[in-house]
A protein has these predicted regions:
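Polybasic, glycine- and aromatic-enriched phosphate-binding surface used to engage nucleic acids
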Residues: 137-296
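Signature of N6-adenine DNA methyltransferases within the class I
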Residues: 1-151
Length: 296
């Protein structure tokens, strides 16, 4: 049999979805995933399903379980880009065709990347290039770093914000300019630069994601420490999990910065993420780090 579809694309409340489907997605479900699940349930042996899907189905980590299930149980026949976007959401789209037959002899590998426990789909040419770009690289996870957003939400702790320089410096995303820490004075009188709370004093690499001239770029700052500070939640923090001297840690961070500036990284981001934002999980587990000094 043949199932052809162009399912709708919108988020749903998890409580509106039967619990038996929770194993196929993480977080808030999107209705197109349910269309895939229900269609696969009805697909006969050797039957084919052909769907137009949002392009982020290929690598969004929320859909990793769905991709794992497909990779293990179905043969991928076609993954190709479509010229039309979803009209209402402006989402880029793909043609996704699979067959209800076991994937034999590595047939699916040309469309699949396995990385740090995640299953990623892609166009054949893109997957081939991405696999090549992982050569002689590592990841922040393998280097024993964790990646998270800052843990201070300034407008939820206004009562302990202060202008006193005797307190802990609160670093906002707008304090990072030209990859340097440049403390800004805010017009909003409630948004103050210091906080009455214990802070960190060691080195830390923070990222402020943004776009410049049509291409994705990292805005980063290496905070060398020596003073008390905390990070507001619009910045991403890259934290090392081992005990090393500040000097050695700064060296590790400088190697990461060199990798972020590497032309291979820029090409990888273009191939893998396109115009989509990079979240903390992807930064930690997916983005290759190229400096040979960091390979374990």
């Amino acid at each position: 049999d043949l199932i052809i579809g162009n399912p709708p694309y919108f988020g749903m409340r998890k409580s509106d979805v039967e619990s038996k489907y929770y194993d196929y997605f993480e977080g808030r479900p999107n209705i197109f995933v349910l269309f895939i699940i229900l269609s696969l349930e009805k697909l006969n042996s050797d039957g084919i399903m052909s769907f137009i899907l949002p392009k982020n189905f290929l690598n969004c980590l929320y859909y990793n379980k769905m991709r794992e299930y497909i990779a293990e149980n179905y043969s991928i026949l076609v993954i190709d880009e479509c010229s039309d976007d979803f009209i209402e959401t402006k989402q880029e789209t793909i043609m996704f065709i699979i067959q209800n037959t076991a994937p034999l002899n590595g047939k699916n590998t040309k469309y699949i990347l396995q990385q740090n426990g995640y299953t990623i789909f892609g166009l054949e040419q893109n997957i081939s290039e991405i696999k090549t770009m992982y050569t002689n690289s590592t990841t922040l996870k393998r280097m024993n770093f964790t990646v998270n957003v800052g843990n201070v939400v300034w407008n939820q702790c206004k009562d302990i914000l202060t202008c006193s320089k005797d307190e802990t410096l609160l670093i906002y995303s707008s304090d990072i300019k030209d990859n340097k820490l440049q403390i800004k004075k805010y017009n909003n009188e409630e948004k103050k630069n210091y906080i009455k709370k214990d802070g960190n004093t060691g080195p830390l690499l923070v990222l402020n994601r943004g776009y410049g001239k049509g291409e994705y770029k990292f805005e980063y700052c290496l905070i060398e420490g020596g003073f008390s500070y905390l990070i507001e939640n619009h910045l991403i923090c890259i934290k090392y999990n081992d005990e090393v001297s500040d000097e050695d840690l700064i060296g590790l961070y400088e190697n990461i910065i060199n990798s972020l500036e590497d032309e291979r990284t820029k090409k990888f981001i273009s191939l893998y993420f396109g115009n989509n934002a990079i979240n903390t999980t992807e930064l930690c587990n997916i983005l290759p780090i190229y400096s040979t000094d960091l390979n374990n």
